[in-house]
From Swiss-Prot:
Residues 1-20 form the signal peptide. GO terms for biological process: activin receptor signaling pathway; eyelid development in camera-type eye; hair follicle development; hematopoietic progenitor cell differentiation; hemoglobin biosynthetic process; male gonad development; negative regulation of cell growth; negative regulation of cell population proliferation. This is Inhibin beta A chain. Residues 263-275 have a biased composition (Basic and acidic residues). GO terms for cellular component: activin A complex; extracellular region; extracellular space; inhibin A complex. CDD domains: TGF_beta_INHBA. It comes from the Eukaryota. InterPro entries: Cystine-knot_cytokine, Inhibin_betaA, TGF-b_C, TGF-b_propeptide, TGF-beta-rel, TGFb_CS. One of its GO terms (molecular function) is hormone activity. It comes from Equus caballus.
Length: 426
């Protein structure tokens, strides 16, 4: 819902700019809307007094976001030593070697974490029976082919404990990854099969845990580093052997049931006591306790798909929609007496053209809705034929500020959607 509201607000702001822009030859400039990006984009930048106008627009925007009618009047500033001591005690910032205050940007870190969570995928892979006894095979889904950074990976195993008395209350469960080392190359299928039987295998301990053997329950084994190594090697298969040397003393057993084992046990169950119904119930319960691998992963920062989604930076060489960097130092505008941190504001804004061939592509558009509208407009369909696309922010990030109010109180405020990160066509 917040994302839809933001998109609606940006589209409405863009429409206001188009409607309120003066016609050629008219005097003055239209009133700047609250959106700093749109306001700065409409200001003339090729005239000598353009910079002061842009700075004034930034000032008004900051005061508006802080819900202030005017800048606070700091007549008796707090002594710097007292200020720095309070900041250290309250952990709202840190003091650099030069004496400047650096605010703890918790909200920025939270926004980055939320963005990473949105880009993270969760994959659950159920175990298949391995080629050897007490081994499991996990085949990671192809959905994870673009995911190269493992956030978390866990193997879930169910330990079944009988109700009879036991001699042990704890058992150790170990997960050993099986690795193959081929011996040379094979030319024919027969040679390949023979080589597979003769190849060297090694085991590596990837997870170990001491668990309670007094009750039947699930146990979680972290295997993040092992899965990360597999992905780094371009592999998608994990073979592990489960070892529990003390389990036989307690009567406990790990449920290691895959599809292959189920078929084998179905045949055995029919032979024993002719109890097909009872065996079926047990098998169903066993299947509900089937081991699985839970994987949380995301794309790397340099993944080509992620790079394509980033907006353009204005470099003076392009005239299509891009982000223009604009930094205002609070010291330069005389506001460092009441704003403690940060030292300035990145008042980035969007500018540039949105030609039909650019606005109609999903990679540069604000939304799928914008792409559809532009496709209709290109075909001359009413009522979209006369609509024009404009360059607006598509991604905003928050900003934290530390400042004095009129009562000389120190205020820390986290302001959402303050800094333009990316631009696109509406």
């Amino acid at each position: 819902m917040p994302l839809l509201w933001l998109r609606g607000f940006l589209l409405a702001s863009c429409w206001i700019i188009v409607k309120s822009s003066p016609t050629p030859g008219s005097e003055g400039h239209s009133a700047a809307p609250n959106c700093p990006s749109c306001a700065l984009a409409t200001l003339p930048k090729d005239v000598p007094n353009a910079q002061p106008e842009m700075v004034e627009a930034v000032k008004k925007h900051i005061l508006n976001m802080l819900h202030l009618k005017k800048r606070p009047d700091v007549t008796q500033p707090v002594p710097k030593a007292a200020l720095l001591n309070a900041i250290r005690k309250l952990h709202v910032g840190k003091v650099g070697e030069n004496g400047y205050v650096e605010i703890e940007d918790d909200i920025g870190r939270r926004a980055e974490m939320n963005e990473l969570m949105e880009q993270t995928s969760e994959i659950i892979t159920f175990a298949e029976s391995g080629t050897a006894r007490k081994t499991l095979h996990f085949e990671i889904s192809k959905e994870g082919s673009d995911l190269s950074v493992v956030e978390r990976a866990e193997v879930w195993l169910f330990l079944k404990v009988p109700k009879a008395n036991r001699t042990r209350s704890k058992v150790t469960i170990r997960l050993l990854q099986q690795q193959k080392h081929p011996q040379g190359s094979s030319d024919t299928r027969e040679e390949a099969e023979e080589a597979d039987l003769m190849e060297e295998r090694s085991e590596q301990l990837i997870s170990e845990k001491v668990v309670d053997a007094r009750k039947s329950t699930w146990h979680i084994f972290p295997v993040s580093s092992s899965i990360q190594r597999l992905l780094d090697q371009g592999k998608s298969s994990l073979d592990i052997r489960i070892a529990c040397d003390q389990c036989h003393e307690t009567g406990a057993s790990l449920v290691l049931l895959g599809k292959k084992k189920k078929k084998e046990e179905e045949g055995e169950g029919k032979k024993k006591d002719g109890g097909e119904a009872g065996a079926g119930v047990d098998e169903e319960k066993e299947q509900s306790h089937r081991p699985f691998l839970m994987l949380q992963a995301r794309q790397s920062e340099d993944h080509p798909h992620r790079r394509r989604r980033r907006g353009l930076e204005c470099d003076g060489k392009v005239n299509i929609c891009c982000k223009k960097q604009f930094f205002v130092s609070f010291k330069d505008i005389g506001w460092n007496d009441w704003i403690i941190a940060p030292s300035g504001y990145h008042a980035n804004y969007c500018e540039g053209e949105c030609p039909s061939h650019i606005a109609g592509t999903s990679g540069s558009s604000l939304s799928f809705h914008s792409t559809v509208i532009n496709q209709y407009r290109l075909r001359g369909h009413n009522p979209f034929a006369n609509l024009k696309s404009c360059c607006v922010p598509t991604k905003l990030r928050p900003m934290s500020m530390l400042y004095y109010d009129d009562g000389q109180n120190i205020i820390k405020k986290d302001i959402q959607n303050m800094i333009v990160e990316e631009c696109g066509c509406s």
